[in-house]
Amino acid sequence: MSRSTKKGPYVDEKLFEKMQKLNKTGDRKVVKTWARASVITPEFVGHTIAIHNGKKFFPIFISEQMVGHKLGEFAPTRTFKGHGGMTKQETSLV
């Protein structure tokens, strides 16, 4: 179930304030954030945001196509190592 349209999209207040401040000054420095649930707004476009994935920060350049998506969608939290294959011991027995 999606968020109520009456409430509007969730945007982390501190992150939004930082982006507005950067837009006023014209700075393009990387902003670190843990707010993965925050929705990308048009104010974020053109900036680089380092999104935490639980272990480290992934720098993501925000483009216009990303508006409306959540920050966490662009920083994967899980790494797939592949399904179990044959080990050295198993191959020597065959």
Curated annotation (Swiss-Prot):
- One Pfam entry name: Ribosomal_S19
Q: Which SUPFAM superfamilies match?
A: Ribosomal protein S19
* One annotated GO molecular function: rRNA binding
Q: Which GO terms describe its biological process?
A: ribosomal small subunit assembly; translation
Q: InterPro entries per the record?
A: Ribosomal_uS19 (IPR002222), Ribosomal_uS19_bac-type (IPR005732), Ribosomal_uS19_CS (IPR020934), Ribosomal_uS19_SF (IPR023575)
Give GO cellular component annotations, separated by semicolons. Answer: cytoplasm; small ribosomal subunit
Q: Which UniProt keywords apply?
A: Ribonucleoprotein, Ribosomal protein, RNA-binding, rRNA-binding
Keyword Ribonucleoprotein present in the record's keywords: the answer is yes
Q: Which NCBIfam families match?
A: rpsS_bact (TIGR01050)
Q: Which family does it belong to?
A: Belongs to the universal ribosomal protein uS19 family.
Q: What does this protein do?
A: Protein S19 forms a complex with S13 that binds strongly to the 16S ribosomal RNA.
Q: What is the name of the protein in this document?
A: Small ribosomal subunit protein uS19
Gene name linked to the record: rpsS
